[in-house]
From Swiss-Prot:
Main location: cytoplasm
PROSITE patterns: RECF_1, RECF_2
Assigned GO CC terms: cytoplasm
Family: Belongs to the RecF family.
Lineage: Bacteria, Pseudomonadati, Pseudomonadota, Alphaproteobacteria, Rickettsiales
Gene designation: recF
UniProt keyword annotation of Nucleotide-binding present: yes
Keyword Methyltransferase attached: no
Protein species of origin: Rickettsia conorii (strain ATCC VR-613 / Malish 7)
Binding site for ATP: 33-40
Matches recorded under Pfam families: SMC_N
UniProt GO BP: DNA replication; DNA synthesis involved in DNA repair; double-strand break repair; SOS response
Compartment(s): Cytoplasm
Superkingdom field: Bacteria
Full protein name: DNA replication and repair protein RecF
Length: 360
């Protein structure tokens, strides 16, 4: 098994940190400090070395320390391709983010070729009651760990969709280019939908196989393209292309693309109660979310032979003793780098003896 982990992390003008340097090993790491000390900021900085805008989905302008024009995050990281230096930096004045791998610029969506990461934050506990966009992004992040190329597909799809919207809204007479764009969107959509379905199959098996103290979930996806594939429809790409063509007039008025894999919803049910997670209590929702994360970790390691970095923000809060103890034993047995934030060590003191403590 190959472990992805940080050897060091350097922050410059990042959030509340003027300068911060951490040295770490392939072990559990506990960040302990009062609320507002910057624990979650450190997790967010690490999450920037994975496709997307980090675990907060923050705007670039909010990441730099107040009154500073630039900020920098640098990591010496054991990646899928070996030991490497990664940097990501922002400038308010240009509103640009630049990411580098061993001093060579790379696209944000390429990060999944080098790293693998899973995170759980208090904000995510509302994912079942929020909009479908949050759940869809959550599912796609899971897919990244099984298929690193998926991030690039999602990025390309969003680019072509944006181009299509511009052509329609600006009323350009460019049917040939529009046709090419829609054909590209259709082809990419087919790959995205199949990747999601394949990953859901893996994940459902992982959930059913893993005996633990958390409720099991049934996973599915509610999307026209995915359902057509499940129903065995042939010529999916042609079907999507035709739908995009037929919705041009409608989409021109709306100013957006009304059909496609960007409209799909990730559905989660409490398996035993047979009800959608959004109708469960907040405690049950958190427990279901943890169960999904544990299954993802377990199966990603089993299937890809790669252990991702795990970021857990205040995960032990409001867990009963039985579930807290199970989670500690599960995490300790993973033999990988995980980062945990907490305001105190109450209830996790035994776990702390096996971890690197960083006090803020």
């Amino acid at each position: 098994m190959k472990n992805i982990f940080l050897h060091s992390l350097n922050l410059e003008n990042y959030r509340n940190f003027k300068n911060l340097e951490l040295k770490t090993d392939n072990t559990p790491i506990i960040l302990i400090g009062e609320n507002g000390s910057g624990k979650t900021n450190i997790l967010e900085a690490i999450s920037l070395f994975y496709p997307g805008r980090g675990l907060r989905s923050a705007k670039l302008a909010n990441v730099c320390k107040t009154s500073e024009d630039h900020c920098l995050v640098k990591a010496l990281l054991q990646s899928k391709l070996g030991l490497a230096e990664f940097t990501t930096q922002f400038k308010r004045s240009s509103n640009r983010r630049i990411t580098e791998y061993n001093e060579s610029k790379i696209a944000n969506n390429e990060l999944s070729k080098f790293t693998s990461m899973v995170w759980l934050t208090p904000h995510m506990e509302g994912i079942f009651t929020s909009g479908s966009s949050d759940r869809r992004k959550f599912l796609d992040r899971i897919v990244y760990n099984f298929d690193p190329k998926h991030a690039e597909l999602v990025s390309k799809y969003e680019y072509y969709m944006h181009e299509r919207n511009k052509i329609l809204v600006e009323d350009r007479r460019d049917d040939n280019w529009l046709k090419i764009i829609e054909e590209k969107m259709a082809d990419i959509s087919n790959h995205i939908a199949n990747n999601r379905l394949k990953t859901l199959e893996f994940m459902q098996q992982a959930i059913d196989d893993l005996e633990n103290e958390f409720p099991k979930a049934d996973l599915s996806i509610d999307g026209i393209v995915e359902q057509k594939i499940l129903n065995g429809k042939k010529n999916i790409v042609s079907f999507i292309t035709a739908e995009l063509y037929q919705t041009r007039s409608k989409d021109k008025l709306l100013g957006r693309t009304s059909f496609g894999v960007h409209k799909s919803d990730f559905l989660v049910k409490h398996q035993k109660k047979n009800i959608l997670a959004k109708f469960c209590s907040t405690g049950e929702q958190k427990a279901i979310l943890i169960a999904i994360i544990l299954a993802e970790m377990n199966y990603a390691i089993k299937l890809t032979k790669i252990a991702p970095i795990l970021l857990l923000d205040e995960v032990f809060v409001h867990l009963d003793d039985k579930r807290r103890q199970y989670l500690i034993e599960f995490l300790t047995g993973l033999n990988m780098q995980l980062w945990v934030t907490t305001t105190n060590l109450e209830g996790i003191d035994n776990f702390a003896t096996k971890a690197q403590l960083i006090k803020l």
